[in-house]
Swiss-Prot record:
Name of this chain's protein: Acetylglutamate kinase
Family recorded in the similarity comment: Belongs to the acetylglutamate kinase family. ArgB subfamily.
One MF annotation (Gene Ontology) recorded for this entry: ATP binding
Pathway: Amino-acid biosynthesis; L-arginine biosynthesis; N(2)-acetyl-L-ornithine from L-glutamate: step 2/4
Any single Gene Ontology cellular-component annotation: cytoplasm
Location of the protein in the cell: Cytoplasm
Length: 295
């Protein structure tokens, strides 16, 4: 390779860094909550790249907090153990036996692996769950099938949050990695929806952004029409769109809506199948995915 080619490549890298400068200045010291899931969690290379992105945010002066689910991994483990599992109203029926597996997979497998990948770059990540330090108190969630209530067991929503454990970690320069298991008022553990938990945490932390990783490029106003991708939408506009959305996008967009209506300045849905999608959203002028604003 010629010296000229080397210089051109170096200049291109420098231009990319300079493009990020205003965003580095804008978000320095800000908390960003990232909901980690989908293919970004399933693909080994994307897992490593996501971990590196979180470390980059930390070195860039931001305060990332990761909230993860683990539905596919839970299903694999249940099958391996020969435990029957079913879904009602789009939610996994969580018996006490299933709850034991949920806790084992989220805390002992998914969370631990992500902590390890982040800490390959330095001693930054600390794993915790909604059970630690009274972080979350859950309330049992009601599901409906054909308009009728059904019992789905130990599945919960966030009733309240005590963020002191997370803020202490952030003040110490750590990257909290949160597994979505939390007790109710009676101490019974519940499996929380990770999108809902991420939104609740973003509100409680007064985060600058909520970023939700998905397996699609963003919100489509008229799925599967690929030309209907929405780059920006207000809370009121999103509320009108929700009833018509594809079922898999509803909890993610509801989380974004809840976050911005709860005081988070912006929430984003980005394609986790694209390497470094979180960085593309935060540090480029074009942004990435769909942004939800208060309006």
């Amino acid at each position: 390779m010629s010296v000229t080619a080397d210089l051109t490549g170096a200049q291109a890298k420098a231009a990319t860094l300079i493009e990020a400068l205003p965003w580095l200045a804008r978000f320095a010291g800000s908390c960003v909550v990232v909901k980690y899931g989908g293919n970004a969690m399933a693909d080994p290379e994307l897992r490593r790249e996501f971990a590196a992105d979180m470390v980059f945010l930390r070195y860039a002066g931001l305060k990332p907090v990761v909230v993860h689910g683990g539905g596919p991994q839970i299903s694999v483990m249940l099958d391996r153990l020969g435990i029957d599992s079913e879904f009602r109203g789009g939610l996994r029926v969580t018996t006490p036996e299933v709850m034991d597996v949920v806790r084992m997979v989220l805390l002992g497998q998914v969370g631990r692996e992500l902590v390890g990948l982040i800490n390959a770059h330095g001693p930054f990540a600390m794993g915790l769950s909604g059970e630690d330090g009274g972080l979350f108190t859950a309330v049992r969630r009601q599901a409906y099938v054909d308009g009728q209530p059904v019992d789905i067991g130990q599945v919960g929503d966030v009733e309240s949050a005590d963020i002191s454990a997370v803020t202490h970690l952030l003040e110490a320069g750590r990257i909290p990695v949160l597994s979505t298991v939390a007790p109710d008022a009676d101490g019974v553990p519940h499996n929380l929806n990770a999108d809902t938990a991420a939104a609740a945490l973003a509100i409680a932390l007064r985060a600058r952004k909520l970023v939700v990783l998905t397996d699609v490029p963003g919100l489509y106003a008229n799925w599967p029409d690929r030309s209907s991708l929405v780059s920006e939408v207000t809370a009121d506009e999103l509320a009108k769109l929700l009833p018509s959305l594809e079922s898999g996008m509803v909890p993610k967009m509801e989380a974004c809506l809840r976050a911005v209506r709860g005081g988070v300045p912006a929430a984003h849905v980005v394609d986790g199948r694209v390497a470094h999608s979180v960085l593309l959203e935060i540090f480029t002028s074009e942004g990435f995915g769909t942004m939800v604003t208060p309006g």
